[in-house]
């Protein structure tokens, strides 16, 4: 009798866990997504290409929804890059004695994207939201050896798998990756 009291709850837990899914609470009829060409309202033209690439890679890697053509898809994502800011983030005061003025030590890139997710089967707007990604970089050094936690993930340089390449381009990629992770998380938790 005691064995049954232990075994039955254990079986119920195991059966419940076997149906766990990373798709969260996406509407049951939505199995696929189409990512429309990204509108870019900024002067930084490469940003939309980087965001689209990172978003498509996230869908492939996370296996949340299948990427399909618009005609075959259950849903559609429309993205607009609405803001791109590349501004000084920190200054090196030590250079004042040499140069007579402060020198920018690091820059920060902020990218803001407006995202609309449409349910094409039921003609509904599932969400309309803005997402922000950012990263800092040292313009004088390789992002993989600058001693900066460029994406605020507690990893620096060779311990961080996304800190490599040209500083500014890498910062754009890091900011884009943050945006796409936020979009995927929002899709998973929409309902």
Indicate residue ranges for each PLM-predicted region.
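A structural "domain/chain start" motif
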Residues: 16-73, 91, 121, 168, ...
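Generic structural "secondary-structure junction" signal
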Residues: 22-24, 28, 86, 150, ...
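Surface-exposed short loop/turn segments
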Residues: 78-145, 165-166
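C-terminal/domain-edge helix-coil "capping" segments
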Residues: 118-128, 132-191
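Residues embedded in well-ordered secondary-structure elements
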Residues: 6, 24, 68, 102-104
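Sec-dependent bacterial lipoprotein signal peptides
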Residues: 1-16
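A generic short-segment signal for beta-strand/edge and adjacent turn/coil regions
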Residues: 3-5, 36-37, 44-51, 78-86
């Amino acid at each position: 009798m005691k064995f049954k009291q232990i075994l039955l709850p254990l079986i119920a837990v195991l059966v419940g866990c076997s149906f766990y899914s990373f798709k969260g609470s996406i509407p049951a009829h939505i199995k696929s997504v189409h990512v429309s060409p990204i509108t870019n309202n900024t002067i930084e033209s490469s940003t939309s290409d980087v965001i689209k690439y990172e978003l498509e890679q996230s869908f492939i890697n996370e296996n949340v929804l299948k990427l399909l053509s618009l005609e075959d898809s259950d849903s559609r994502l429309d993205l607009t890059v609405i803001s791109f800011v590349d501004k000084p983030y920190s200054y090196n005061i030590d250079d004042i004695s040499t140069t007579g003025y402060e020198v920018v030590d690091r820059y920060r890139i902020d990218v803001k994207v407006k995202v609309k997710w449409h349910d094409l089967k039921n003609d509904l707007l599932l969400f309309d939201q803005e997402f922000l990604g950012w990263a800092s970089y040292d313009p004088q050094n390789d992002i993989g050896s600058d001693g900066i936690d460029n994406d605020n993930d507690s990893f620096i340089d060779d311990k961080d798998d996304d800190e490599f390449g040209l500083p500014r381009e890498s910062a754009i990629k890091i900011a884009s990756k943050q945006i796409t992770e936020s979009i995927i998380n929002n899709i998973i938790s929409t309902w």
